[in-house]
């Protein structure tokens, strides 16, 4: 589904995609030809049971393909960190894997809960999750990248103290026809 935002008769939106191993092999030249301007590529995850950090198996191909096709790229990492130290470990993993690529778009910290399952980070307090998020974002910023936080209404209203995260960009996930967010 494509959505265009029009302001004063001018399209103000940009076409982008997010990809991971689940999209399989991608023809990035075709993606560019379809008008896609940017992509967020999944860099990896921390396992919700094991806590093991795993690189997305298509990360390198997707980053190389996006860079070669001229599609501006950012990355995202799905966290299951349960301590500030684990968030710093995740950030170091992400930063180390970005060195070979052009990454003009943000490095995104995905803080969603594992629904219907027992994710290792599901029982964090708001303060713990906020501290973990700050630790990741500050490490990414110190490395010269733009940090961003991914979440939905639940993440941004019940799981994180947004007053402590105002300085970071947000990627707001909303899967309905009309956008709703109860805060500025």
PLM features per residue range, with description:
Residues 9, 28-35, 58-71, 94-103, ...:
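Acidic (Asp/Glu)-rich catalytic clusters
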Residues 27, 55-62, 87-90, 94, ...:
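Stable alpha-helical elements in mature extracytoplasmic
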Residues 15-19, 39-41, 71-77, 107-109, ...:
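Hydrophobic faces of well-ordered beta-strands that scaffold small-molecule active sites
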Residues 17, 31, 66, 109, ...:
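Conserved, mostly hydrophobic/aromatic
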Residues 1-42:
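Boundary/entry segment of secreted carbohydrate-active catalytic domains
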Residues 97-107, 111-184:
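Surface-exposed substrate-engagement region within the catalytic domains
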Residues 65-83:
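Substrate-binding cleft and catalytic face of glycoside hydrolase catalytic domains
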Residues 16-27, 44-58, 80-89, 154-158:
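Acidic-and-aromatic substrate-binding clefts and catalytic sites of carbohydrate-active enzymes
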């Amino acid at each position: 589904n494509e959505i265009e935002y029009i302001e004063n008769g001018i399209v103000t939106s940009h076409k982008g995609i997010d990809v991971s191993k689940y999209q399989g092999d991608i023809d990035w030249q075709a993606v560019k030809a379809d008008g896609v301007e940017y992509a967020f590529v999944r860099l990896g995850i921390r396992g919700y049971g094991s806590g093991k950090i795993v690189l997305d198996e298509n990360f390198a191909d997707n980053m190389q393909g996006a860079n070669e096709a001229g599609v501006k790229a950012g990355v995202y990492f799905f966290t299951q960190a349960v301590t500030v130290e684990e968030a710093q470990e995740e950030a170091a993993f992400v930063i180390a894997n970005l060195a070979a690529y052009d990454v003009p778009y943000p490095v995104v910290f995905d803080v969603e809960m594992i629904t219907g399952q027992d994710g290792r980070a599901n029982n964090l307090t708001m303060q713990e999750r906020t501290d973990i998020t700050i630790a990741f974002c500050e490490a990414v910023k110190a490395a010269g990248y733009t940090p961003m936080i991914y979440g939905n209404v639940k993440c941004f209203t019940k799981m994180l103290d947004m007053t402590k995260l105002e300085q970071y960009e947000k990627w707001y996930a909303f899967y309905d026809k009309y956008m709703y967010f109860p805060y500025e």
